[in-house]
Amino acid sequence: AVSLYLNSFQHLLRWKRDYRSWQVEAGGQVIFIENHSRAGTGFVPVIPNYTETQAGIYGIGKYHLARGGVEAGLRLDMQETRASGYDWTGSPYGGTRKFNNVSYSLGGHYQLSKGWRLTSNFGLAWRAPHVYELYSNGNELGSGMFVRGDSAMHSERSYKWISSLRYGDGMFSVC
């Protein structure tokens, strides 16, 4: 049977301050993951032993108006993945990958009239590849498929714009 040891550590820190019409928030996040397979089980895990360190800091500023408000945010992220293992042929494989990114968002809302509210937000999102996507190499026990990762894979980035017009009168609402 496959036997894996997983240790993880997460820490979040958030600071928030209100000053008149302004609201400011800043924070950070650290995640450490260590995953190792137990030797001597007779099975070769589909992913190698790995450690992953993620860290991020962010800031958000909001300004409130009588009938609406605006907000902007910025986030800096980094991720380092170190993997080392043996594939089903007994050959060593793995490596170290580092990913960095800056993401942002800009949004606002406005009360058009009684019951009507317009909201819009635009932002850049980011996701670094998981160790499975980078270094999987072997038989996946749950599906019986042979899978192989791509250690040259880059992080994903996407833009997202959401706008909505909402009406609500207390008894009824529609978006």
PLM-predicted stretches and their roles:
Residues 167:
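Flexible glycine-/small-residue-rich
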Residues 164:
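Small/polar-residue-rich segments within soluble enzyme cores
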Residues 34-36, 78-89, 96, 110, ...:
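Surface-exposed extracellular loop regions of Gram-negative outer-membrane beta-barrel proteins
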Residues 1-111, 123, 170-175:
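Face-selective signature of the C-terminal outer-membrane beta-barrel domain
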